[in-house]
Curated annotation (Swiss-Prot):
Its EC number is 3.5.1.-. The keyword Hydrolase applies. It comes from Shigella flexneri. Involved in pyrimidine catabolism. May facilitate the hydrolysis of carbamate, a reaction that can also occur spontaneously. It is an enzyme of class 3 (hydrolase). InterPro entries: AB_hydrolase_1, AB_hydrolase_fold, AB_hydrolase_sf, Pyrimidine_utilisation_RutD. This is Putative carbamate hydrolase RutD. Residues 14-115 form the AB hydrolase-1 domain. The gene is rutD. Keywords: Hydrolase.
Amino acid sequence: MKLSLSSPPYADAPVVVLISGLGGSGSYWLPQLAVLEQEYQVVCYDQRGTGNNPDTLAEDYSIAQMAAELHQALVAAGIERYAVVGHALGALVGMQLALDYPASVTMLVSVNGWLRINAHTRRCFQVRERLLYSGGAQAWVEAQPLFLYPADWMAARAPRLEAEDALALAHFQGKNNLLRRLNALKRADFSHHADRIRCPVQIICASDDLLVPTACSSELHAALPDSQKMVMPYGGHACNVTDPETFNALLLNGLASLLHHREAAL
């Protein structure tokens, strides 16, 4: 699996791995790259079955497989210890990595994540699946911003959204891969295992997220032994895109306080 690695800003700089959500594209993290690369070696990638890592996914594709293939790719690239920043599905992969490879994961950041899928989130995906079956890729892509962004943010950026739609349609991961990745997301359940995650965890959520209720992050915070939770008042599900200044400040402060503190203790 292909990875994109930035140059380390100094010798032995900590590694931060960015894992996007259901869309799977590493470019999702573009608003974070410049600030992170000043202090960390940053790893981005298109998830298997998407972008520049095309593949046909098995029907039983799982979050555990997503975690294993990423860890193997990191080890092959010479990276054995790393922090993980995951958005939604990416946060699930991050938790799986922390469970399966505890010696490797130094810290986890969960952005609008959850322990197991909330009934509201499941309902949103059911609506989106119906759109996919009835209207194909175009209907899925055109509906996607409604679940990602606040209404006023979208209204002020109509040309940008049109360009994003065209790009997403041109690089659509395919119906079968999308549904198999979505099914993996829906099957994931960390409610009985989260207390075994021992690395520090920063939880970031947005209070106006239409797709994932903030209660999901509260449940994560209660279940994870070494976690702290920050709530952004605005930004929607893709709060790192819509309000990068606020998000980046929270992320950088979290990495500095949790990751560096852990490294100093080792």
